[in-house]
Amino acid sequence: MTVDVKKVINHKIKPIEYNLTRKDVALYAISLGCGKKHLKFVYEGSDNFSALPTLGVIFPGQMIVDVISEGIDGIEFDPMMLLHGEQELEILNEIPVEGVFVTESKITNLYDKGKGALLILQCITSEKSSGKPIFKNIFSFFIRGIGGFGGDRGPNEKPIQIPKDRAPDAISKQATSEDQAVIYRLAGGDLNPLHIDPEMSKIGGFEVPILHGLCTYGIASRGVLEHFCDNDPSRLKSIKTRFTKHVYPGETIETEMWKINPTTILFQSKTNRDGSYVLSSGVAIIEPIKKGSL
């Protein structure tokens, strides 16, 4: 199979608009397990109603579906061979709880990993009325079976080293419901049938429909927000992780967190199924507590 890296990187992606409502903000929080104990995230009438920072991952959703279904110049692949490898979200400005947003996207790199290819997609989401950028997403997708085309292997980044000489500074446990993926697919905008249709999940090699990786990502970020940001969304500046294994709805996600310095939190997440880690090499950058704020 011929791969033309230049054509892939030059592939044009149309900007997309997203009309965000307060209801969307609340529903997204509910899809990550928030409830009546978290009114600032689920009740639009709350005086300090706020969006969870990882709301930023939902805006490029439809664009990604369109790109995968319509195809990418310079490369051919079976969408079933595409895996979401890593996710990085940077919060650039204060998050509005409603309004029209525009997401502009581009493919920045395609790396040859031998057994597959690593596609890097960058998305900038801005508030339409002001033009102010709010979120920057970097999606890393591994496409199985199309490597070996002689391309650049990409940077040799070493995995984040989680401290082994001390226990986590905080542990967050979040039980998911058996219907978690049913809710998240509507709130998070990922309508992939793999997460709801038993027949499609079997084709994908899973016993039952699996939970969205970005739902697990959002749940882990809630742990960081609660334990190190006092549930203040404005203090979470970026969060990045690697997806290492799937989660089945109904399992409990346990996120272990270490504070490395005033602004850096390392984390990893596992489930109660067999103790395997489902998120690894997690890094969150936070704003430290200002002196005199306590």
UniProtKB/Swiss-Prot annotation:
Its EC number is 4.2.1.119. It catalyses: a (3R)-3-hydroxyacyl-CoA = a (2E)-enoyl-CoA + H2O. Residues 165-269 form the MaoC-like domain. Signal peptide: none annotated. It comes from the Eukaryota. GO terms for cellular component: peroxisome; phagocytic vesicle. It holds the Pfam family MFE-2_hydrat-2_N. SUPFAM superfamilies: Thioesterase/thiol ester dehydrase-isomerase. GO terms for molecular function: 17-beta-hydroxysteroid dehydrogenase (NAD+) activity; 3-hydroxyacyl-CoA dehydrogenase activity; enoyl-CoA hydratase activity. It is found in: Peroxisome. A motif (Microbody targeting signal) lies at residues 292-294. The keyword Lyase applies. GO terms for biological process: fatty acid beta-oxidation. (3R)-3-hydroxydecanoyl-CoA binds at residues 84-85, 113, 190-195, 213, 243. Keywords: Lyase, Peroxisome. Belongs to the short-chain dehydrogenases/reductases (SDR) family. This is Probable enoyl-CoA hydratase 2. The lineage of its organism: Eukaryota, Amoebozoa, Evosea, Eumycetozoa, Dictyostelia.
